Amino acid sequence: MGKLENASWIHDPLMKYLNSTEEYLAHLCGPKRSDLSLPVSVAYALIFLVGVMGNLLVCMVIVRHQTLKTPTNYYLFSLAVSDLLVLLLGMPLEIYEMWHNYPFLFGPVGCYFKTALFETVCFASILSVTTVSVERYVAIVHPFRAKLESTRRRALRILSLVWSFSVVFSLPNTSIHGIKFQHFPNGSSVPGSATCTVTKPMWVYNLIIQATSFLFYILPMTLISVLYYLMGLRLKRDESLEANKVAVNIHRPSRKSVTKMLFVLVLVFAICWTPFHVDRLFFSFVEEWTESLAAVFNLIHVVSGVFFYLSSAVNPIIYNLLSRRFRAAFRNVVSPTCKWCHPRHRPQGPPAQKIIFLTECHLVELTEDAGPQFPGQSSIHNTNLTTAPCAGEVP
């Protein structure tokens, strides 16, 4: 997330005589501290507190509640883990560099770690969002197939591939980064000038950024958009069909509410990550920097940084706002002994019609219009039918 260079983008062939090393270093690298350090740091601190607490709660409720251990929620768990990595490991480095643009004190290993971390979580996040969208598409459009194939064991295998691919594809950008020193005209290194930046030819960096932005943002978001469009058509078609009292029905309210929540998650994800990729692509396509271009880039860079970290904090808020089941799980984890923190049981309504959840193992997830369910509650009312556990699942 850090800038590759600062004032050195703009080549000054008539470098004037400077009286001190500090002035010379400031001429080469720009100011040591960003003008927006204080307000951005305050924003980052708020995002850090909300994001860490929220994502820890997400992980806890999924781990502790058996009813939430579904394939879709495993992907959301992966997304929460990547958000925690960014907030706990990436944000402190970002704040430090905001107040001390140079020197970089953590050496080559710290530089490699920083670059690999941001690249890995960037790729893992978009791949997790893509996989959960594909799972939702299969559950909506091909429910029988989802019942047979969408298992927790399969989700774990896919997540292993997601993180493995993310680490592998982070290596190209990581390998071209390193510690770079500024030099005096006589060739000696300027003290305190170490920065973590690109050390290979810039065309290599530009090519990597353009390729990864296409493979890990433009292409996945296009696929996700198509999938949610098809899901919307299917849900709209189902709503237009007249209810058949004899036919077996799918629990459409739950299916629709889960899809709505995931759609909002994807939409917010796209909004938050678009500035990040605009920032990277902007830098990669500019060949000759001017003061106006540098000013525009610096503005985009600050905005992209705030939105990048904001994306790591908003997901738990989305779950809490749009998922009754998740709100109940939150309350159960935060204050399990507080009787006022849990919703009262609703009065028993009229008998419900017989409903079979054709994709029960997949669709009973974070959201449920019928209210929160925990172990001991039943999803089928007034019916003698029983449901068998999904293949590969624990009852």
From Swiss-Prot:
State the family it belongs to: Belongs to the G-protein coupled receptor 1 family.
What SMART domains is this protein classified in? 7TM_GPCR_Srsx (SM01381)
Query: Cystine bridges: which residues?
Result: 111-196
Function per UniProt: Receptor for the neuromedin-U and neuromedin-S neuropeptides.
Tissue distribution is:
The highest level is detected in the uterus. In the central nervous system, high expression levels were found in the hypothalamus and moderate levels in both the medulla oblongata and spinal cord. Expressed in the hypothalamic paraventricular nucleus (PVN) and suprachiasmatic nuclei (SCN) of the hypothalamus. Expression is low in the gastrointestinal tract. In other peripheral tissues, moderate expression was observed in the lung and ovary.
Q: Which UniProt keywords apply?
A: Cell membrane, Disulfide bond, G-protein coupled receptor, Glycoprotein, Membrane, Receptor, Transducer, Transmembrane, Transmembrane helix
Where, in residue ranges, is this chain on the Extracellular side?
1-41, 96-115, 179-212, 279-293
Cytoplasmic topological domain: 63-74, 139-157, 234-257, 315-395
- Which terms in the Gene Ontology molecular function aspect does this entry carry? GTP binding; intracellularly calcium-gated chloride channel activity; neuromedin U binding; neuromedin U receptor activity; neuropeptide receptor activity
Q: Where does the record place Polar residues bias?
A: 375-387
**Species of the source:** Rattus norvegicus
Pfam families from the xrefs?
Answer: 7tm_1, NmU-R2_C_term
Q: How does it sit in the membrane?
A: Multi-pass membrane protein
Q: Which residues are glycosylated?
A: 6, 19, 186
The encoding gene: Nmur2
Q: Where in the cell is the protein located?
A: Cell membrane
GO biological process annotation, one example: arachidonate secretion
Q: Which Gene3D superfamilies match?
A: Rhodopsin 7-helix transmembrane proteins
**One Gene Ontology cellular component:** plasma membrane
Ranges for region Disordered: 374-395
Transmembrane feature ranges: 42-62, 75-95, 116-138, 158-178, 213-233, 258-278, 294-314
| Keyword check for Cell membrane | yes
**What protein does this entry describe?**
Neuromedin-U receptor 2
